[in-house]
């Protein structure tokens, strides 16, 4: 039974929908200022949005920059937008902090091949992910 449904008096549609020990809900905390200085004793995840240049192989080259610099990409989602949905934007999460040398090099490659890059944030990697 959903706790949220109980609190707000809502009808539960399916009681077994999320009954897996691996299910998680993620919440994002937004700030105008960066708040995660690099600590070499911690593991980080960085998230960003980017659009590649409209040239053959641009996405491949962005991905290659992460691979070459030994940066693990853990999530990549694509979204089409624009009047005719011809522009593709990607949401990406990587293991790493922009203060780490290898991540810095990978991001420099990324800026070279992308028409737009927007850093969304950096957060400490949850111990939950380490169990996966």
What role is predicted for each listed range?
Residues 1-132:
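Domain-level signature for soluble enzymes in the chorismate/prephenate branch of the shikimate pathway
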């Amino acid at each position: 039974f959903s706790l949220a449904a109980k609190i707000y008096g809502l009808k539960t549609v399916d009681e077994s929908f999320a009954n897996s020990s691996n299910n998680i809900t993620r919440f994002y905390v937004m700030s105008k200022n960066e708040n995660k200085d690099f600590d070499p004793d911690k593991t980080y995840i960085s998230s960003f949005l980017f659009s590649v240049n409209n040239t053959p192989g641009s996405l491949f080259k962005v991905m290659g920059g992460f691979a070459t610099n030994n940066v693990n990409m853990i999530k990549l989602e694509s979204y089409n937008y624009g009047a005719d949905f011809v522009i593709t934007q990607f949401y990406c999460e990587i293991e790493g902090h922009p203060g780490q040398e290898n991540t810095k090099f990978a991001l420099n490659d990324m800026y070279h091949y992308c028409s737009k890059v927007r850093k969304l944030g950096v957060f400490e990697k949850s111990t939950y992910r380490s169990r996966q």
